[in-house]
């Protein structure tokens, strides 16, 4: 059995050794939930990796979006090159959920483009979990969404080994039952037979196939072949073919499921007709009958997940199977950026239910489709294994779950300390922001200003522009591609000041920023809560000269808590640097060079009209914007962005 072994040129430093020790000892004592409070740049990922290495248990790391998950995945792969590090996120390149808008009588069919590589990685993840112990899965919150039964997925595998006797026709039938397609084209999830040679392209491989050579009904040899070069890369003693779908179902079980679907359909049609909903009755009858016929013929259909209650043998309202059900009971779970991820997990169920209820009411789906859903928060809580919440600003939920006990990691390898916080009167704040900005710009640095309203951001931007400051603003009305272009301009110095409303959601990581100005810091609310203030203050922590000015006529409870926490961290960091002779250095980070092949994008009031590159990251940002509209039931806006994605995908760099 393989063991976790970190490969790194660096050893644990600063607070890392103590954090690793405390977390590991807590797990050993049976502590179910712990908090790692780690400031940005302190090496939280290395700490997580070290705990996994110490405990030698399978691990799941949950991030709040695909981009962050991808970063963590790459880091973990570097730390564990000889172990199974897997990536499990939604496999849609874009996704417009099925929806119905009653007021305009518009039905929007589910429209999705499945990313084949991500689908392959999902299969690789579930296969690794079921076959080995040295596995780390980095996932987005999609890991709490419904997935096929792990028991069926595991039971329906086809083990093949040298010397094994198996009828060729029987093997082909089994592969078809696992949703593999027969054909001459060699692509993932297919197989072909030429004479006594069966070539299988496994669901979890990107470019390797298995070549099974038979002598009569006996397997003579098994080779792993590079599909691009046609060269054998390994001779294998045995392989296990996993299903090409997580919703694969044995034929007898499938027929039982179809019978139950038929029963529900008849009840549904009778109910619609009884309530004089003739159109809805005909609609559900036609759509469901078509799906039933497809499943009878091929074992699957479009939207098969909506019948998961029956396919997985679940009772009405019973929690769906998810990735969590595939994991061993002794697995470790890390919730990264828990102050964002936990609220996201909490909100998933309700948004999904509202959308599906609309479809059911108007005859587009059977009521059982409600069971194709994410876990409720309570269900997720009941499935938690040994868990570590990771954040620079843990939320109330996390600290309550651990009775206020946290493991701190405050020291950065670069020696950078948290910025100095200054409180100034709110009266006259505009004039002072201008003066402070000009002074900071003259030293070659950038400025971030956070305002409370879009109008204030626009007015301040206009005022600064009139006096010759290169400025732009960001808020929710600024489109994704424009937003990315503005941030790039700030990094390169085309813009010196960036004004925003909620700069937290921009994910700004700007080493050139030496000043953050928080206007109306004493106006209590989400944007001026303790967590938001600490996160905003952290925007200046990438620069050794970082300062934060909070404009307020009174010091609120949130302000005091945020400033006290920042000062506490700074004192710890300065003391450590002094004791170890460390001189802080600003982070050096290259500006992305992906703005070369350009297409025209409409400019904003905050910047001149110019062009912006369309990269993979651009498309991902738009997809997130589209999903946000869909979650808010703004399906027409989501549809508009989906169309924009389709156009821009043709211009990706």
Swiss-Prot record:
SMART domains: DEXDc, HELICc. GO terms for biological process: nucleotide-excision repair; SOS response. InterPro entries: Helicase/UvrB_N (IPR006935), Helicase_ATP-bd (IPR014001), Helicase_C-like (IPR001650), P-loop_NTPase (IPR027417), UVR_dom (IPR001943), UVR_dom_sf (IPR036876), UvrB (IPR004807), UvrB_inter (IPR041471). Its main location: cytoplasm. GO terms for cellular component: cytoplasm; excinuclease repair complex. One of its GO terms (molecular function) is ATP hydrolysis activity. Pfam families: Helicase_C, ResIII, UVR, UvrB, UvrB_inter. Keywords: ATP-binding, Cytoplasm, DNA damage, DNA excision, DNA repair, Excision nuclease, Helicase, Hydrolase, Nucleotide-binding, SOS response. A motif (Beta-hairpin) lies at residues 91-114. ATP binds at residues 38-45. Residues 616-651 form the UVR domain. The keyword Endoplasmic reticulum does not apply. Belongs to the UvrB family. The beta-hairpin motif is involved in DNA binding. Forms a heterotetramer with UvrA during the search for lesions. Interacts with UvrC in an incision complex. HAMAP family: UvrB (MF_00204). The UvrABC repair system catalyzes the recognition and processing of DNA lesions. A damage recognition complex composed of 2 UvrA and 2 UvrB subunits scans DNA for abnormalities. Upon binding of the UvrA(2)B(2) complex to a putative damaged site, the DNA wraps around one UvrB monomer. DNA wrap is dependent on ATP binding by UvrB and probably causes local melting of the DNA helix, facilitating insertion of UvrB beta-hairpin between the DNA strands. Then UvrB probes one DNA strand for the presence of a lesion. This is UvrABC system protein B.
């Amino acid at each position: 059995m393989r063991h976790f072994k970190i490969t790194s040129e660096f050893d644990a430093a600063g607070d890392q050794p103590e954090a690793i020790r405390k977390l590991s000892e807590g797990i050993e004592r049976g502590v179910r939930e712990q908090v790692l409070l780690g400031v940005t740049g302190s090496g939280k990922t290395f700490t997580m990796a070290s705990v996994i290495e110490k405990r030698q248990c399978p691990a799941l790391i949950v991030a709040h979006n695909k981009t962050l998950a991808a970063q963590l995945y790459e880091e973990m792969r570097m730390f564990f090159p000889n172990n199974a590090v897997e990536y499990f996120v939604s496999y849609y390149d874009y996704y417009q959920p099925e929806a119905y808008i009653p007021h305009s009588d518009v039905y929007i069919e589910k429209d999705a483009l499945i990313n084949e590589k991500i689908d392959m990685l999902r299969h690789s993840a579930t296969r690794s979990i079921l076959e080995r112990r040295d596995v780390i899965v980095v996932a987005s919150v999609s890991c709490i969404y419904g997935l096929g039964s792990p028991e069926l997925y595991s039971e329906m595998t086809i083990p093949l080994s040298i010397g094994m006797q198996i009828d060729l026709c029987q093997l082909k039938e089994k592969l078809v039952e696992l949703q593999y397609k027969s054909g001459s084209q060699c692509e993932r999830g297919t197989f072909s037979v030429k004479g006594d040679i069966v070539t299988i392209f496994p669901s979890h491989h990107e470019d390797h196939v298995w070549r099974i050579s038979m002598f009569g009904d006996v397997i003579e040899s098994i080779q792993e072949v590079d599909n691009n070069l046609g060269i054998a890369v390994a001779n294998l003693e045995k392989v296990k073919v996993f299903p090409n779908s997580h919703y694969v179902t044995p034929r007898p079980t499938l027929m039982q499921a179809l019978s139950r679907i038929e029963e529900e359909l008849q009840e549904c049609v009778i109910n619609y007709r009884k309530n004089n909903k003739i159109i809805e009755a005909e609609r559900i009858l036609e759509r469901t009958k078509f799906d039933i016929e497809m499943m009878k013929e091929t074992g699957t259909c479009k939207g098969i997940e909506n019948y998961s209650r029956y396919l997985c043998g679940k009772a009405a309202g019973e929690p769906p199977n998810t990735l969590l059900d595939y994991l061993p009971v002794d697995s470790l779970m890390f919730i990264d950026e828990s102050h964002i991820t936990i609220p996201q997990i909490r909100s998933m169920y309700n948004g999904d239910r509202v959308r599906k209820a609309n479809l059911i009411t108007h005859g587009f789906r059977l009521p059982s489709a409600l069971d194709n859903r994410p876990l409720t928060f309570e269900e997720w809580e009941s499935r938690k294994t040994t868990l570590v919440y990771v954040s620079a600003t843990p939320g109330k939920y996390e600290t309550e779950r651990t009775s206020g006990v946290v493991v701190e990691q405050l020291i950065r390898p670069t020696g950078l300390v948290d910025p100095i916080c200054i409180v100034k009167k709110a009266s006259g704040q505009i004039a002072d922001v201008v003066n402070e900005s000009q002074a900071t710009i003259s030293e070659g640095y950038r400025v971030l200003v956070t305002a409370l309203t879009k109008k204030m951001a626009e007015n301040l931007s206009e005022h600064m522009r009139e006096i010759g400051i290169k400025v732009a603003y960001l808020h929710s009305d600024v489109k994704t591609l424009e937003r990315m272009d503005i941030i790039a301009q700030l990094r390169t110095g085309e813009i010196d000041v960036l004004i925003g409303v909620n700069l937290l959601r921009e994910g700004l990581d700007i080493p050139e920023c030496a000043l953050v100005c928080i206007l109306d810091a004493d106006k209590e609310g989400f944007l001026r809560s303790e967590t938001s203030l600490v996160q905003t203050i952290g925007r200046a922590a990438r620069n050794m000269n970082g300062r934060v000015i909070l404009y307020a006529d009174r010091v609120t409870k949130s302000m005091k808590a945020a400033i006290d926490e920042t000062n506490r961290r700074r004192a710890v960091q300065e003391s450590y640097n002094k004791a170890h002779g460390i001189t802080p250095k600003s982070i050096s980070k290259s500006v992305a060079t992906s703005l070369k092949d350009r297409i025209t994008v409409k400019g904003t009031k905050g910047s001149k009209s110019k062009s912006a590159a369309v990269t993979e990251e651009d498309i991902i940002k738009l997809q997130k914007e589209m999903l946000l509209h869909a979650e808010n039931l703004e399906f027409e806006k989501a549809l508009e962005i989906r169309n924009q994605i389709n156009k821009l995908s043709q211009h990706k760099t």
